[in-house]
Amino acid sequence: MTATQPRPTRAGNKLEGRVAFVTGGTRGIGAAICRSFAGQGAAIAAGYSGNQQAAEQFCKDIGSTHPDSRTTVHRGDIGSAEDCRRTIAEVIEQHGRLDILVNNAGITADKTVLKMTDDDWRRVIDVNLSGAFYLSQAALEHMLDRGTGRIVMVSSVIGETGGIGQANYSSAKAGLFGLTKTLAREAAMQVQRKGLTDGIGVTINAVTPGYTATEMLETVPDKVLDALKAKIPLGRLGLPEEVARVVHFLSADASGYITGQVWGVNGGLDM
């Protein structure tokens, strides 16, 4: 941002008073989701696993562009059940509540099935699928007590189509579909039992991004990118902000009658 550019300000107050925890929230799609939430007044808890300096800088950047939105960063290993539960407790302790959980963090360890090691398989499943379960389990306990909350799973179009060398990744991302639908049914059942159906409810949905212009694609050769774009009916890569807008909608009150659904944000790749 240059000195001549206007500083972004709050775009509205639809999420004012809400607290959103976004895993993998300091870069790529996760960072775009955090900015979108902050623009509508939400307090942000951004999860990260590695670069503390970059995470703290992201926190400062959000604070400078959205001074009315409190932002914290939380380090943890999403593949660890203990760390997932600790992080949820930490967010609630620091912010006093948790209204929105976005399970966005993910890793890859691509190898063809005959070359994939046990560790390659387990680590990707642990982070991309099991971590989403542990985080959601801990968050739901808090949300169901209050009768309100939103959980959004960031899956992938690869969970629908499969991908060569991605048996672990595609299995984990496909697993998020079943997890989403099961948690949605259980949450709805619990809310009904508590007699809290008149509120905004507790909903769980998923989005499936396609090939998106993030840091992960910056080192991909142009020829490979051109081949990827040729597969996309809309003929271009997606933008992190385009995914963020759908996640934002599914996290807001306006989506209160939508639960257990999978939303494609992939330029038509899953048609």
Please name every model-derived segment:
Residues 26-27:
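Conserved glycine-rich cofactor-binding loop
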Residues 40-57:
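Conserved glycine-rich Rossmann-like NAD(P)H-binding loop of the short-chain dehydrogenase/reductase
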Residues 112-113, 120-125, 151, 217, ...:
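Substrate-binding pocket helix/loop in short-chain dehydrogenase/reductase
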Residues 133, 144, 236-265, 270:
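C-terminal substrate-recognition "lid" of short-chain dehydrogenase/reductases
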Residues 136, 172, 180:
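Active-site helix of classical SDR
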Residues 156:
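Residue(s) in the substrate-gating loop at a strand-loop-helix junction
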Residues 188, 198, 203, 258-260:
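Short, small/polar-rich loop/turn modules that mediate ligand/substrate recognition or access, typified
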